[in-house]
């Protein structure tokens, strides 16, 4: 009942819902997006896929399947907490690629997850994965992911 009330209120007030859920919560988000197709939804932290150190294809499949809902967006953030948690986060690149292929840069956004993230890595560490180390992103893609998508979705710009 809580999700129903939240999605109904978001629909009435034209607000985006930011969902901090693990991968096992994505099916319920899918159901709610089917019931409320006009609600803008942002999945935080790549659906927390890999929070236990393992990136499961089934979890990535579920996250990518939500792209069928045109108002669903994904936030790439908390890289320090996902996957193998190694500097550079290169193990997350295949996950990011699949999500990029499903959603495109207009429905992806980056976030720092500060202040918690600053306890384990610098701000530079956080932005460098998207900004510098993912070769399949164009400069325009990076601008959208790092700035434009969030400006449009969160700040209605």
Regions picked out by a protein language model, each given a short descriptive name:
Residues 1-109:
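Catalytic pocket-lining loop regions of alpha/beta-barrel enzymes
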Residues 81, 116-118:
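Short, active-site-adjacent cap segments at secondary-structure transitions
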Residues 98, 102-109, 118-157:
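Mid-to-C-terminal alpha-helical segments outside catalytic/metal-binding sites
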Residues 113:
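Active-site glycine-centered loops adjacent to acidic/histidine catalytic or metal-binding residues
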């Amino acid at each position: 009942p809580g999700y129903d009330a939240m999605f109904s209120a978001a629909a009435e007030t034209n607000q985006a819902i930011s969902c901090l859920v693990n991968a096992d919560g994505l099916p319920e988000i899918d159901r709610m997006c089917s019931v409320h197709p006009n609600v803008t939804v942002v999945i935080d932290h790549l659906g927390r896929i890999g929070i236990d150190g393992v990136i499961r294809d089934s979890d990535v499949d579920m996250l990518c399947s939500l792209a069928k809902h045109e108002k669903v967006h994904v936030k790439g953030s908390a890289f320090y907490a996902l996957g193998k948690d190694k500097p550079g986060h290169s193990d997350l690149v295949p996950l990011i690629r699949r999500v990029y292929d499903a959603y495109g840069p207009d429905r992806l956004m980056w976030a720092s997850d500060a202040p918690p993230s600053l306890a384990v890595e610098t701000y530079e560490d956080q932005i460098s994965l998207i900004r510098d180390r993912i070769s399949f992103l164009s400069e325009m893609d990076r601008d959208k992911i790092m700035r434009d998508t969030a400006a449009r979705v969160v700040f209605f710009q």
